């Protein structure tokens, strides 16, 4: 897996990793940032990591295991972290958004360049996918999503275009 972590040095510098500290990576991804944190931790230090992408969890578990054993990965969204971590931490990091592997793997349904079934689920255990949102949500719901989450000023015209183009089955439609 070839993946270049964004702002890696700046993130590690900003965390000011203490060898015996406890850290959380809320968006593990392919463990670029977590790997660097784990390299700086001694036996007393610990890393908790969260990701909802099963493929990322599998890959990162193997990658981090080659660096150390003082970590725990949870296959869940970071919004659930308080259910799993009840200890003080010295630092926490998030790298929000899709990762390049998610965009590159056509069958994930995130691609801007390759045609694939419209999916866009980071967690394949979730029933709701992009196909259902695009094809079943009301005009009002689409406008709300585009405006509130995408900060899209043309939300109304885009939502109208989506409604008029239904059904939409693939990423390039």
State where each predicted segment sits.
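S-adenosyl-L-methionine-dependent methyltransferase catalytic core, i.e., the SAM/SAH-binding region
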Residues: 1-173
